[in-house]
């Protein structure tokens, strides 16, 4: 137990590995999957696909270990960790994705996941209320997964609007976190703005070039798993990605590593989790990602509600 205690006290190395593996599995596995089917010449395509698979497994086992280390703070994380372990063996069941086991398991994950996110908010500061739109976005993804896979009925809503509202809350939370006027905070804001600039130029290029607009509509929504019911909303998606990159970089530079990495995990998996390619990790990851966003908070809302609660 002392080993786990030491690991919990020094979570940063795991967050670094988790951040790197989640980024590269997204780039080489999720994001690479769709451009690779287009009539484009991709050099060393086989190597890139292999790298994607390697980083996917590194990501899986790192997020599994991270969830184990979060159990001390979030008691419901025990059930999410157990669900991750069970998901390893689910494919051993013939036609598991069409079995009552699969449907029951998805409903179970949804109920526990929403409860865990509520626990995460209650065990963090008052500023975490700004993350409620992000919690709502993850909850919608979980409910959308049940609606599609269990009841075979797609949940129609403006996912891009949910994403943008989530971003508004997350950026506000990032700016308010550690309000000390330090050089590090100013550097974080400056670098975040610099990261946003290329996306602004991309928005202009895509908006003024119909061919690029069509190409981006073929790639970006499929990469993220998000449904754009209006193809002209592709520029809004580019804006959302730019603001996401800005907020994540700001969080990491300001020292809130878990929030930056957690939000990246949320946005890169929350919409994929609706269908998830029948891979449960894409349904579970946003839940763990949200818990990571609030992990560094010391003051707790639950202590304000009930001061005796420890």
From Swiss-Prot:
What is the recorded membrane topology of this protein? Answer: Multi-pass membrane protein
Membrane-spanning parts: 51-71, 76-96, 98-118, 126-146, 156-176, 187-207, 233-253, 264-284
Give the UniProt keywords, A-Z.
Cell membrane, Electron transport, Membrane, Transmembrane, Transmembrane helix, Transport
**Domain of life here?**
Archaea
Task: Pull one GO CC term from this UniProt entry.
Answer: plasma membrane
According to its UniProt record, where is this protein located? Answer: Cell membrane
Please list which residues make up the signal peptide: none
What is the name of the protein in this document? Answer: Cytochrome b558/566 subunit B
Q: Which gene encodes it?
A: cbsB
């Amino acid at each position: 137990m002392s080993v786990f205690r030491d690991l919990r006290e020094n979570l940063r190395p795991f967050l670094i590995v988790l951040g790197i593996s989640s980024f590269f599995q997204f780039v080489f596995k999720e994001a690479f999957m769709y451009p690779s089917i287009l009539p484009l010449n991709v050099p060393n395509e086989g190597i890139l696909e292999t790298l994607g698979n390697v980083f996917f497994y590194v990501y899986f086992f790192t997020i599994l270990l991270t969830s184990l280390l979060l159990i001390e703070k979030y008691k419901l994380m025990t059930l999410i960790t157990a669900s991750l372990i069970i998901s390893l063996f689910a494919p051993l069941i013939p036609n598991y994705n069409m079995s009552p086991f699969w449907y029951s398991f998805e409903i179970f994950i949804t109920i526990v996941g929403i409860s865990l996110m509520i626990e995460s908010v209650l065990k963090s500061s008052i500023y975490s209320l700004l993350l409620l739109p992000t919690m709502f976005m993850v909850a919608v993804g979980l409910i959308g997964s049940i609606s599609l896979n269990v009841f075979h009925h797609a949940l129609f809503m403006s996912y891009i609007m949910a994403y943008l509202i989530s971003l508004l809350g997350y950026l506000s939370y990032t700016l308010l976190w550690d309000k000390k006027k330090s050089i590090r905070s100013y550097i974080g804001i400056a670098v975040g703005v610099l990261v946003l600039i290329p996306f602004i130029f991309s928005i202009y290029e895509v908006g003024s070039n119909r061919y690029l607009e069509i190409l981006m509509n073929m790639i970006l929504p499929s990469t993220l798993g998000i449904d754009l019911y209006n193809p002209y909303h592709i520029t809004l998606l580019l804006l959302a990605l730019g603001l996401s990159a800005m907020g994540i970089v700001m969080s990491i530079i300001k020292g809130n590593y878990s929030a930056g990495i957690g939000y990246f995990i949320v946005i890169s998996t929350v919409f994929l989790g609706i269908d998830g390619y029948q891979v449960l990790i894409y349904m579970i990851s946003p839940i763990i990602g949200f818990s990571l966003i609030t992990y560094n908070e010391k003051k707790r809302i639950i202590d304000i509600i009930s001061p005796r609660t420890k």
